[in-house]
Amino acid sequence: MDVNPTLLFLKVPAQNAISTTFPYTGDPPYSHGTGTGYTMDTVNRTHQYSEKGKWTTNTETGAPQLNPIDGPLPENHEPSGYAQTDCVLEAMAFLEESHPGIFENSCLETMEVVQQTRVDKLTQGRQTYDWTLNRNQPAATALANTIEVFRSNDLTANESGRLIDFLKDVMESMDKEEMEITTHFQRKRRIRDNMTKKMVTQRTIGKKKQRLNKKSYLIRALTLNTMTKDAERGKLKRRAIATPGMQIRGFVYFVETLARSICEKLEQSGLPVGGNEKKAKLANVVRKMMTNSQDTELSFTITGDNTKWNENQNPRMFLAMITYITRNQPDWFRNVLSIAPIMFSNKMARLGKGYMFESKSMKLRTQIPAEMLANIDLKYFNESTRKKIEKIRPLLIDGTASLSPGMMMGMFNMLSTVLGVSILNLGQKRYTKTTYWWDGLQSSDDFALIVNAPNHEGIQAGVDRFYRTCKLVGINMSKKKSYINRTGTFEFTSFFYRYGFVANFSMELPSFGVSGINESADMSIGVTVIKNNMINNDLGPATAQMALQLFIKDYRYTYRCHRGDTQIQTRRSFELKKLWEQTRSKAGLLVSDGGPNLYNIRNLHIPEVCLKWELMDEDYQGRLCNPLNPFVSHKEIESVNNAVVMPAHGPAKSMEYDAVATTHSWIPKRNRSILNTSQRGILEDEQMYQKCCNLFEKFFPSSSYRRPVGISSMVEAM
């Protein structure tokens, strides 16, 4: 049957069909090869936006640094990072005036967190720059290595202490004249295998001690490693993101805790809430502006876009903000919070793997590591790369580039949101002192601005004033990419608003399907995703029913568990057919055992085992859920588990689903190959730690420590 796609949309307002234009089906693009070029782009661009600043040299590391703060006021519309300190401080003061006590209360909340947080907070998170090995490692490993080195250098670090004590060690380590570290290297040798008599390459991991002088250590402590951001949809060019090392992470965490606490109290902030809560917050602001504008005023909304938000922000500005926010607090607290921005003002960007060269004629490939870029002959490079390298050379030290201005992606999302909201806050009539006024929403670098005024000239004047005010604090609203509309239709953080939020269902598409954890969890997650989308995203009953059928089909295909009476032959069909024939009540078999699907859109909230329990043969129940069955998972099963689902936008989010322990809740065994690598020792430590924890728990059931999420966790193993 031919379907004319335009007919589908005849009854649908254009805004509701917007989700069909999003690039969310199919695989997202991944980057291959080195991120060195993208990182050099970031460094060069950041310096270009601040080029009229003052150059200084860092006395400890010898790194050249550019400081654009209080630089010249912009004369054109080019993006620039010349924030004016007094303007930022004034914006902070007005923010506090409009929200009495907000900074004071947030400081008190943060102080409590600072005193209670334990070091293992830093084991959360994915890849982290491990300064001891000079490459990325899982967070738990990088932390363990750092603590080990600190210990061997007479610092008091321990894995279960308070984070604040670990940060004291970090501060002390920076004063040391030298630090001794253990590095790993691989030895390869060819030996004859006794059994097969073939030659094999044996790898051994060697360890050697290395001393870092103060300068080298500081450079490593201030280094952000860079990678290419993967899976970004709808973009032609890739871009670089940063992973900081353990020295910086703890300080950043406390600053973000403070900023998060402030954001929670600001009605214009799109962080840290999400989902329906965020939509409600936004709808309130819109309602406020529309109610006031009904008869006398015009109201327009800008769907805003900022040019290179991160690259024009400045850590020195964040330092000024923190100094102001914490001005009545005890010194120790002010010091702890001011270290993160100070470290960022002195940060170094690691250029990544370097470049790969290959000669077609001689079939040779060679890697040029980033360290060599400072003095290699440029004739080997193409023109664009040559320009990049020439530009970055004055900034290079040991394969890292000095990068004082700019923030790198995703480091101070909360704090930069506070800065954005402080400008939105200045739109109140008591501050504009004229007929126009504004309000809006800010979520990291994304914003929506609602301007009200008696006539079009007033709207224009309001937008201009907002634009110029932003320039004064280093925020550059893009005139090309922002657009203005009558209030009632706009987009903010991929939520489309048209007299209420329109469901952008395509964003959820990537999370449909089989997760690949195990048969039990996958079934549960699959139906929960469909249920959640019926609740939150306008997934209609007919579409949901179809999604469910497709999911079951996909699930059977993945686990090769087609119905017992099917003709499809797979490597499981022999066993499943036998089970089908032996079973009296066939409706009681789980789908993963070749049973029929009993789900429909009315019973998605019931776990499959519960749905079919009454229908099961007694001996099948016994095999499926008998705690003495060696295949039933013995760890205490919480009734609710968390799955990681991948929406199209933003980070992977956690989703709860019901977990019933059966023979299908298996946990795959770890891949053997880790046992031959340098990670092996870590693995053994971790198992030891786990055993001790389990013992401890048996004796003290009320103990309230957290199990570490180490590299042995499921997701890492996958």
Swiss-Prot record:
Enzyme superclass (EC): transferase
Keywords linked to the UniProt accession: Eukaryotic host gene expression shutoff by virus, Eukaryotic host transcription shutoff by virus, Host cytoplasm, Host gene expression shutoff by virus, Host nucleus, Host-virus interaction, Inhibition of host RNA polymerase II by virus, Nucleotide-binding, Nucleotidyltransferase, Phosphoprotein, RNA-directed RNA polymerase, Transferase, Viral RNA replication, Viral transcription
Location of the region described as Disordered in the Swiss-Prot/TrEMBL record: 50-81
Keyword hit for Phosphoprotein: yes
GO biological process terms held by the UniProt record: symbiont-mediated suppression of host gene expression; symbiont-mediated suppression of host mRNA transcription via inhibition of RNA polymerase II activity; viral RNA genome replication; viral transcription
Its EC number(s): 2.7.7.48
GO cellular component: host cell cytoplasm; host cell nucleus
Sequence ranges assigned to domain RdRp catalytic in this UniProt record: 286-483
Modifications after synthesis and translation: Phosphorylated by host PRKCA.
GO molecular function, one term: nucleotide binding
InterPro entries in UniProt: RNA-dir_pol_NSvirus (IPR007099), RNA_pol_PB1_influenza (IPR001407)
Chief location of this protein within or outside the cell: host cell
Annotated family: Belongs to the influenza viruses polymerase PB1 family.
Short sequence motif named Nuclear localization signal, residue ranges: 187-195, 203-216
Gene: PB1
Superkingdom field: Viruses
Protein name: RNA-directed RNA polymerase catalytic subunit
Catalytic activity: RNA(n) + a ribonucleoside 5'-triphosphate = RNA(n+1) + diphosphate
